[in-house]
Amino acid sequence: MSWTTNFDKLIEKSLLNVNKICDVKSLPSNLAIAKDKSDAIVYKMHGDVDNPDLTILTRDQFEKYQQTHKAFLDSFCYDLTNKTFLFLGLSFDDPNLHYVLKYARMLHGENQRRHYYILRKVSQEPGEKTEDFEYRKREQELFIEDMKNYAVETILIDDYSEITEILSAIQKRYLRRTVFISGAAVEYTNYSEKEVKEFVKKLSARLIRDNFRIVNGYGLGFGDEVLTGAAQQIQNDHKTFEENIKIMPFPQGLPNPKEAWHQYRQEMIQNTGISIFLMGNKKDKTSCTIIGSNGMQEEYDLSKSHGNFLIPVGATGYKTKDLWTQQMSAHDNSFSPTKNEMESLDDETKSLDEHLDTIMSILERINS
Protein backbone atom coordinates (compact mmCIF):
# COMPACT_ATOMS: atom_id res chain seq x y z
CA MET A 1 0.00 0.00 0.00
CA SER A 2 1.37 3.42 -1.02
CA TRP A 3 0.13 6.97 -0.58
CA THR A 4 1.54 9.64 -2.88
CA THR A 5 0.92 13.27 -3.78
CA ASN A 6 2.64 12.79 -7.16
CA PHE A 7 0.76 12.62 -10.44
CA ASP A 8 3.25 10.42 -12.33
CA LYS A 9 3.19 6.63 -12.75
CA LEU A 10 6.59 5.69 -11.33
CA ILE A 11 5.11 3.61 -8.50
CA GLU A 12 2.73 1.76 -10.80
CA LYS A 13 5.48 1.04 -13.34
CA SER A 14 7.79 -0.26 -10.61
CA LEU A 15 5.09 -2.64 -9.39
CA LEU A 16 4.36 -3.78 -12.94
CA ASN A 17 8.06 -4.53 -13.47
CA VAL A 18 7.90 -7.13 -10.67
CA ASN A 19 4.63 -8.62 -11.96
CA LYS A 20 2.41 -6.99 -9.33
CA ILE A 21 -1.20 -6.09 -10.11
CA CYS A 22 -1.80 -2.52 -8.99
CA ASP A 23 -5.10 -0.97 -7.89
CA VAL A 24 -4.84 2.81 -8.37
CA LYS A 25 -7.10 5.18 -6.42
CA SER A 26 -6.81 8.69 -7.85
CA LEU A 27 -10.36 9.97 -7.36
CA PRO A 28 -12.81 9.76 -4.44
CA SER A 29 -15.09 7.70 -6.67
CA ASN A 30 -12.34 5.05 -7.04
CA LEU A 31 -12.18 4.28 -3.33
CA ALA A 32 -15.29 2.10 -3.23
CA ILE A 33 -14.23 0.03 -6.25
CA ALA A 34 -11.79 -2.83 -5.60
CA LYS A 35 -9.70 -4.31 -8.39
CA ASP A 36 -9.80 -8.11 -8.43
CA LYS A 37 -6.66 -9.95 -7.27
CA SER A 38 -4.60 -6.80 -6.85
CA ASP A 39 -1.24 -7.09 -5.07
CA ALA A 40 -0.92 -3.44 -4.07
CA ILE A 41 -3.02 -0.31 -3.71
CA VAL A 42 -1.66 3.10 -4.72
CA TYR A 43 -3.55 6.12 -3.38
CA LYS A 44 -2.86 9.25 -5.44
CA MET A 45 -4.16 12.05 -3.22
CA HIS A 46 -3.74 14.82 -5.77
CA GLY A 47 -4.86 12.93 -8.85
CA ASP A 48 -3.28 11.24 -11.84
CA VAL A 49 -1.51 12.44 -14.97
CA ASP A 50 -4.14 10.62 -17.06
CA ASN A 51 -6.80 13.01 -15.71
CA PRO A 52 -5.06 16.41 -15.67
CA ASP A 53 -8.35 18.32 -15.32
CA LEU A 54 -9.00 16.57 -11.99
CA THR A 55 -5.58 17.04 -10.37
CA ILE A 56 -5.08 19.20 -7.28
CA LEU A 57 -2.85 22.11 -8.27
CA THR A 58 -4.26 25.50 -7.28
CA ARG A 59 -4.55 27.15 -3.87
CA ASP A 60 -8.34 27.11 -4.24
CA GLN A 61 -8.32 23.35 -4.86
CA PHE A 62 -6.13 22.76 -1.80
CA GLU A 63 -8.42 24.89 0.37
CA LYS A 64 -11.50 22.97 -0.78
CA TYR A 65 -9.82 19.55 -0.55
CA GLN A 66 -11.44 18.68 2.79
CA GLN A 67 -14.85 19.03 1.14
CA THR A 68 -14.11 17.65 -2.34
CA HIS A 69 -11.86 14.77 -1.21
CA LYS A 70 -13.10 14.00 2.30
CA ALA A 71 -13.20 10.26 1.50
CA PHE A 72 -9.47 10.37 0.72
CA LEU A 73 -8.68 12.09 4.00
CA ASP A 74 -10.81 9.60 5.94
CA SER A 75 -9.03 6.67 4.28
CA PHE A 76 -5.63 8.24 4.92
CA CYS A 77 -6.48 8.82 8.59
CA TYR A 78 -7.65 5.20 8.91
CA ASP A 79 -4.37 3.91 7.47
CA LEU A 80 -2.33 6.23 9.71
CA THR A 81 -4.12 4.70 12.68
CA ASN A 82 -3.76 1.07 11.61
CA LYS A 83 -0.50 0.90 9.65
CA THR A 84 3.09 2.08 10.05
CA PHE A 85 4.07 4.69 7.45
CA LEU A 86 7.50 5.43 6.03
CA PHE A 87 7.44 8.92 4.52
CA LEU A 88 9.80 9.44 1.57
CA GLY A 89 10.26 12.69 -0.33
CA LEU A 90 6.99 14.08 1.01
CA SER A 91 6.59 17.75 1.85
CA PHE A 92 4.90 18.32 5.19
CA ASP A 93 3.91 21.78 3.93
CA ASP A 94 0.83 20.12 2.40
CA PRO A 95 -2.11 21.53 4.45
CA ASN A 96 -4.17 18.39 3.94
CA LEU A 97 -1.40 16.18 5.29
CA HIS A 98 -1.20 18.43 8.35
CA TYR A 99 -4.96 18.17 8.74
CA VAL A 100 -4.83 14.36 8.85
CA LEU A 101 -1.87 14.29 11.25
CA LYS A 102 -3.61 16.72 13.60
CA TYR A 103 -6.84 14.77 13.42
CA ALA A 104 -5.04 11.50 14.24
CA ARG A 105 -3.35 13.19 17.20
CA MET A 106 -6.69 14.52 18.41
CA LEU A 107 -8.23 11.04 18.23
CA HIS A 108 -5.42 9.08 19.86
CA GLY A 109 -3.39 11.57 21.91
CA GLU A 110 -0.32 9.87 23.38
CA ASN A 111 -1.34 6.49 21.93
CA GLN A 112 -0.67 7.32 18.28
CA ARG A 113 0.92 4.71 16.06
CA ARG A 114 4.57 5.50 15.34
CA HIS A 115 5.64 6.46 11.81
CA TYR A 116 8.99 7.29 10.20
CA TYR A 117 10.29 10.01 7.90
CA ILE A 118 13.60 9.90 6.03
CA LEU A 119 15.20 13.33 5.76
CA ARG A 120 18.60 14.45 4.53
CA LYS A 121 20.59 16.26 7.20
CA VAL A 122 21.29 19.89 6.32
CA SER A 123 24.91 20.57 5.46
CA GLN A 124 26.77 23.79 4.86
CA GLU A 125 26.81 24.67 1.17
CA PRO A 126 29.99 26.01 -0.49
CA GLY A 127 30.17 29.74 0.15
CA GLU A 128 27.25 29.71 2.60
CA LYS A 129 27.62 31.95 5.63
CA THR A 130 27.95 30.11 8.93
CA GLU A 131 25.04 32.02 10.47
CA ASP A 132 22.80 31.06 7.52
CA PHE A 133 23.77 27.41 7.88
CA GLU A 134 23.19 27.48 11.64
CA TYR A 135 19.76 28.99 11.02
CA ARG A 136 18.81 26.20 8.58
CA LYS A 137 20.20 23.60 10.96
CA ARG A 138 18.15 24.94 13.87
CA GLU A 139 15.10 25.12 11.62
CA GLN A 140 15.48 21.43 10.81
CA GLU A 141 15.94 20.53 14.48
CA LEU A 142 12.69 22.32 15.35
CA PHE A 143 10.90 20.56 12.49
CA ILE A 144 12.09 17.17 13.80
CA GLU A 145 10.83 18.00 17.29
CA ASP A 146 7.49 19.12 15.88
CA MET A 147 7.08 15.86 13.96
CA LYS A 148 7.39 13.93 17.23
CA ASN A 149 4.11 15.54 18.29
CA TYR A 150 2.48 13.57 15.48
CA ALA A 151 4.31 10.33 16.32
CA VAL A 152 6.61 10.76 13.31
CA GLU A 153 10.21 9.77 14.04
CA THR A 154 12.76 11.35 11.68
CA ILE A 155 15.63 9.27 10.30
CA LEU A 156 18.47 11.57 9.25
CA ILE A 157 20.73 10.59 6.36
CA ASP A 158 23.81 12.26 4.90
CA ASP A 159 23.17 11.21 1.30
CA TYR A 160 20.11 10.11 -0.65
CA SER A 161 21.91 6.90 -1.66
CA GLU A 162 21.37 5.71 1.93
CA ILE A 163 17.64 5.42 1.22
CA THR A 164 18.28 2.36 -0.94
CA GLU A 165 20.19 0.69 1.90
CA ILE A 166 17.39 1.46 4.37
CA LEU A 167 14.71 0.12 2.03
CA SER A 168 16.75 -3.02 1.35
CA ALA A 169 17.08 -3.66 5.09
CA ILE A 170 13.33 -3.17 5.58
CA GLN A 171 12.55 -5.50 2.68
CA LYS A 172 14.90 -8.16 4.02
CA ARG A 173 13.32 -8.00 7.46
CA TYR A 174 9.82 -8.14 5.95
CA LEU A 175 10.65 -11.11 3.73
CA ARG A 176 12.02 -13.03 6.71
CA ARG A 177 8.43 -13.45 7.81
CA THR A 178 7.74 -15.46 4.63
CA VAL A 179 8.98 -19.06 4.43
CA PHE A 180 9.49 -21.15 1.31
CA ILE A 181 9.09 -24.87 2.06
CA SER A 182 10.97 -27.08 -0.41
CA GLY A 183 10.31 -30.78 -0.19
CA ALA A 184 9.46 -33.85 -2.25
CA ALA A 185 9.43 -37.57 -1.48
CA VAL A 186 8.37 -40.92 -2.89
CA GLU A 187 10.56 -42.89 -0.47
CA TYR A 188 11.07 -42.56 3.29
CA THR A 189 14.04 -44.02 5.21
CA ASN A 190 15.23 -42.20 8.34
CA TYR A 191 11.64 -41.49 9.34
CA SER A 192 8.42 -43.23 8.37
CA GLU A 193 6.02 -41.75 5.83
CA LYS A 194 3.47 -41.20 8.58
CA GLU A 195 6.01 -39.36 10.76
CA VAL A 196 7.14 -37.12 7.88
CA LYS A 197 3.62 -36.20 6.80
CA GLU A 198 2.61 -35.39 10.37
CA PHE A 199 5.78 -33.31 10.79
CA VAL A 200 5.04 -31.26 7.66
CA LYS A 201 1.51 -30.54 8.88
CA LYS A 202 2.84 -29.47 12.27
CA LEU A 203 5.51 -27.29 10.67
CA SER A 204 2.96 -25.46 8.52
CA ALA A 205 0.62 -24.99 11.47
CA ARG A 206 3.40 -23.63 13.70
CA LEU A 207 4.51 -21.19 11.02
CA ILE A 208 0.99 -19.81 10.65
CA ARG A 209 0.46 -19.72 14.41
CA ASP A 210 3.67 -17.72 14.87
CA ASN A 211 2.63 -15.22 12.16
CA PHE A 212 4.84 -16.42 9.31
CA ARG A 213 3.58 -16.64 5.74
CA ILE A 214 4.14 -19.78 3.65
CA VAL A 215 5.01 -20.24 -0.03
CA ASN A 216 5.05 -23.77 -1.44
CA GLY A 217 5.18 -25.40 -4.86
CA TYR A 218 3.01 -28.37 -3.84
CA GLY A 219 5.88 -30.86 -4.05
CA LEU A 220 5.22 -34.57 -4.44
CA GLY A 221 4.39 -36.13 -1.09
CA PHE A 222 4.43 -32.74 0.70
CA GLY A 223 1.88 -30.40 -0.89
CA ASP A 224 -1.23 -31.85 0.75
CA GLU A 225 0.36 -31.76 4.19
CA VAL A 226 1.61 -28.17 3.84
CA LEU A 227 -1.85 -27.07 2.76
CA THR A 228 -3.72 -29.08 5.41
CA GLY A 229 -1.57 -27.96 8.34
CA ALA A 230 -1.70 -24.32 7.31
CA ALA A 231 -5.42 -24.30 6.48
CA GLN A 232 -6.40 -25.78 9.84
CA GLN A 233 -4.34 -23.20 11.74
CA ILE A 234 -5.63 -20.34 9.58
CA GLN A 235 -9.17 -21.40 10.43
CA ASN A 236 -8.38 -21.78 14.14
CA ASP A 237 -6.78 -18.32 14.28
CA HIS A 238 -9.51 -16.67 12.17
CA LYS A 239 -6.93 -15.50 9.64
CA THR A 240 -7.33 -15.16 5.88
CA PHE A 241 -5.97 -17.78 3.51
CA GLU A 242 -4.76 -15.27 0.91
CA GLU A 243 -2.58 -13.33 3.36
CA ASN A 244 -0.94 -16.35 5.00
CA ILE A 245 -0.18 -19.02 2.41
CA LYS A 246 0.53 -19.12 -1.31
CA ILE A 247 0.43 -22.52 -3.02
CA MET A 248 1.89 -22.56 -6.53
CA PRO A 249 1.61 -26.03 -8.13
CA PHE A 250 3.98 -26.53 -11.02
CA PRO A 251 2.22 -26.35 -14.41
CA GLN A 252 2.22 -29.63 -16.32
CA GLY A 253 2.17 -30.53 -20.02
CA LEU A 254 4.32 -27.61 -21.13
CA PRO A 255 6.42 -27.79 -24.33
CA ASN A 256 9.53 -26.58 -22.48
CA PRO A 257 8.90 -27.40 -18.80
CA LYS A 258 12.49 -26.94 -17.59
CA GLU A 259 12.64 -23.27 -18.56
CA ALA A 260 9.10 -22.58 -17.37
CA TRP A 261 9.71 -24.29 -14.02
CA HIS A 262 12.90 -22.29 -13.50
CA GLN A 263 10.94 -19.05 -13.92
CA TYR A 264 8.23 -20.44 -11.66
CA ARG A 265 10.76 -21.20 -8.93
CA GLN A 266 12.20 -17.71 -9.25
CA GLU A 267 8.76 -16.18 -8.84
CA MET A 268 8.07 -18.25 -5.72
CA ILE A 269 11.39 -17.56 -4.03
CA GLN A 270 11.63 -13.84 -4.81
CA ASN A 271 8.83 -13.17 -2.34
CA THR A 272 10.40 -15.10 0.55
CA GLY A 273 13.28 -14.58 2.97
CA ILE A 274 13.67 -18.06 4.48
CA SER A 275 13.91 -21.45 2.75
CA ILE A 276 13.42 -24.77 4.56
CA PHE A 277 14.54 -27.98 2.81
CA LEU A 278 13.15 -31.45 3.59
CA MET A 279 14.10 -34.81 2.05
CA GLY A 280 14.14 -34.34 -1.74
CA ASN A 281 13.88 -37.56 -3.70
CA LYS A 282 12.02 -38.80 -6.76
CA LYS A 283 11.83 -41.80 -9.05
CA ASP A 284 14.01 -41.60 -12.16
CA LYS A 285 11.80 -42.05 -15.23
CA THR A 286 14.44 -44.04 -17.11
CA SER A 287 15.95 -46.35 -14.50
CA CYS A 288 12.97 -46.32 -12.09
CA THR A 289 15.46 -45.92 -9.21
CA ILE A 290 15.18 -43.37 -6.41
CA ILE A 291 17.40 -40.33 -6.99
CA GLY A 292 17.94 -36.94 -5.39
CA SER A 293 15.72 -34.08 -6.50
CA ASN A 294 17.57 -31.81 -8.94
CA GLY A 295 14.70 -29.35 -8.61
CA MET A 296 15.50 -28.96 -4.92
CA GLN A 297 19.13 -28.15 -5.76
CA GLU A 298 17.88 -25.46 -8.12
CA GLU A 299 15.59 -24.07 -5.40
CA TYR A 300 18.50 -24.03 -2.97
CA ASP A 301 20.73 -22.16 -5.45
CA LEU A 302 17.98 -19.64 -6.24
CA SER A 303 17.28 -19.14 -2.54
CA LYS A 304 20.96 -18.54 -1.84
CA SER A 305 21.37 -16.05 -4.70
CA HIS A 306 18.26 -14.23 -3.49
CA GLY A 307 19.80 -13.87 -0.02
CA ASN A 308 17.40 -16.18 1.79
CA PHE A 309 18.26 -17.70 5.16
CA LEU A 310 18.72 -21.43 4.39
CA ILE A 311 17.59 -24.24 6.70
CA PRO A 312 18.33 -27.73 5.33
CA VAL A 313 17.10 -30.42 7.74
CA GLY A 314 19.92 -32.86 6.98
CA ALA A 315 18.44 -35.64 9.12
CA THR A 316 15.63 -36.09 6.59
CA GLY A 317 18.22 -37.36 4.10
CA TYR A 318 18.39 -37.52 0.30
CA LYS A 319 19.04 -34.22 -1.52
CA THR A 320 18.58 -32.24 1.70
CA LYS A 321 21.52 -34.13 3.19
CA ASP A 322 23.63 -33.01 0.20
CA LEU A 323 22.51 -29.42 0.74
CA TRP A 324 23.35 -29.66 4.43
CA THR A 325 26.88 -30.83 3.51
CA GLN A 326 27.28 -28.00 0.99
CA GLN A 327 26.21 -25.46 3.57
CA MET A 328 28.47 -26.78 6.33
CA SER A 329 31.47 -26.47 4.01
CA ALA A 330 30.56 -22.92 2.96
CA HIS A 331 31.31 -21.41 6.40
CA ASP A 332 29.04 -18.42 5.72
CA ASN A 333 26.86 -17.61 8.72
CA SER A 334 25.10 -14.75 6.94
CA PHE A 335 22.58 -17.14 5.39
CA SER A 336 22.98 -20.19 7.63
CA PRO A 337 22.06 -21.40 11.12
CA THR A 338 24.91 -21.62 13.63
CA LYS A 339 27.21 -24.65 13.64
CA ASN A 340 25.41 -26.10 16.68
CA GLU A 341 22.01 -25.57 15.04
CA MET A 342 23.21 -27.21 11.82
CA GLU A 343 24.57 -30.21 13.71
CA SER A 344 21.27 -30.54 15.54
CA LEU A 345 19.34 -30.47 12.24
CA ASP A 346 21.49 -33.37 11.00
CA ASP A 347 21.00 -35.57 14.08
CA GLU A 348 19.07 -38.65 12.92
CA THR A 349 18.58 -39.84 16.51
CA LYS A 350 16.32 -36.87 17.21
CA SER A 351 12.60 -37.03 16.57
CA LEU A 352 11.01 -34.83 13.94
CA ASP A 353 9.23 -32.96 16.73
CA GLU A 354 12.65 -32.06 18.13
CA HIS A 355 13.75 -30.86 14.69
CA LEU A 356 10.58 -28.78 14.51
CA ASP A 357 11.50 -27.09 17.78
CA THR A 358 14.99 -26.37 16.42
CA ILE A 359 13.57 -24.82 13.24
CA MET A 360 11.17 -22.59 15.15
CA SER A 361 13.95 -21.56 17.55
CA ILE A 362 16.10 -20.53 14.57
CA LEU A 363 13.25 -18.51 13.06
CA GLU A 364 12.60 -16.75 16.36
CA ARG A 365 16.29 -15.90 16.71
CA ILE A 366 16.78 -14.42 13.25
CA ASN A 367 13.57 -12.39 13.50
CA SER A 368 14.22 -10.96 16.95
Where are these regions (language model features)?
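Acidic/glycine-enriched connector segments
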Residues: 187-192, 196-367
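SIR2/sirtuin NAD+-dependent deacylase catalytic core
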Residues: 1-178, 185-192, 209, 232, ...
